Amino acid sequence: MAFRQALQLAACGLAGGSAAVLFSAVAVGKPRGGGDADTRATEPPAWTGARAGRGVWDTNWDRREPLSLINLKKRNVESGEDELTSRLDHYKAKATRHIFLIRHSQYHVDGSLEKDRTLTPLGREQAELTGLRLASLGLKFNKIVHSSMTRAVETTDIISKHLPGVSRVSTDLLREGAPIEPDPPVSHWKPEAVQYYEDGARIEAAFRNYIHRADARQEEDSYEIFICHANVIRYIVCRALQFPPEGWLRLSLNNGSITHLVIRPNGRVALRTLGDTGFMPPDKITRS
């Protein structure tokens, strides 16, 4: 009976002029011009990690939140909370990590091969100034990790002279690339989709490998330098601050600039400086 009444009400509604409303509802989402709706995916690639929601900080963003590292199924029900507290303390970070992200200096952009894209004379001056600035901070730097690309290697060579005794490691993970399709898109830079697919996963791997809270065994604060590229740094900053990663191209970095991220033991992340070149004379600042 209820089903028959529903049919009668629907028939009355259509007869009364509600048909237009019904058809209008069906057409929602179709462009007025009659073409197909834009079906492009609006979600970022899976490797960027699922965001908890607008304005919600993911406390376990680096998968090192102590409680997430404990197998609660093995918890001893007799010792109860005391054992849980003890195990949590075992996994808790105690130290702060200071991450210094350095963009390489100006280089010859017209080199036909990557190995030919060496630093310009001005670029070498910029690297000297950056090295002097880092040395003047009076910090005990633990290590330098740098991209294996020529312009990053040469920048590292010069900066290292001002930081004697600091070990250095080369990695392909920090090489320049296209991390994720920027939003809004730009007309002057449009890599192939496969480049985002390949570079994006690699740069995300660099983020996961290098950007995280300190290991629980680390007793003292650390100061680490990463010398790489603008796209990589901008993407890392967005990911570390849990900003939409597709907004990376809205940031701008000068050559030889210093970006300082701080990762606290509780996983909180702060951006101390972004692209600082205030230590350079105005005529030495470039962004190529």
UniProtKB/Swiss-Prot annotation:
PTM characteristics: Phosphorylated by the RIPK1/RIPK3 complex under necrotic conditions. This phosphorylation increases PGAM5 phosphatase activity.
GO molecular function: protein serine/threonine phosphatase activity
Enzyme kind, highest EC tier: hydrolase
This protein's GO CC annotations: mitochondrial inner membrane; mitochondrial outer membrane
Segments passing through the bilayer: 7-29
Phenotype of null mutants: Deletion mutant mice were born at mendel ratio, but weighed significantly less compared to the wild-type (WT) controls at 1-year and older. About 50% of the mutant mice (aged 1-1.5 years) showed lordokyphosis (hunchback), odd gait and swollen foot, and among them about 50% died from unknown causes. These suggest an accelerated senescence (or aging) phenotype in deletion mutant mice.
Mitochondrial intermembrane side of membrane: 30-288
Mitochondrial matrix side: 1-6
Phosphoserine modification, residue list: S79, S86
UniProt free text on domains: The N-terminal 35 amino acids, including the potential transmembrane alpha-helix, function as a non-cleaved mitochondrial targeting sequence that targets the protein to the cytosolic side of the outer mitochondrial membrane.
Protein name per its UniProtKB record: Serine/threonine-protein phosphatase PGAM5, mitochondrial
Organism: Mus musculus
Gene behind the chain: Pgam5
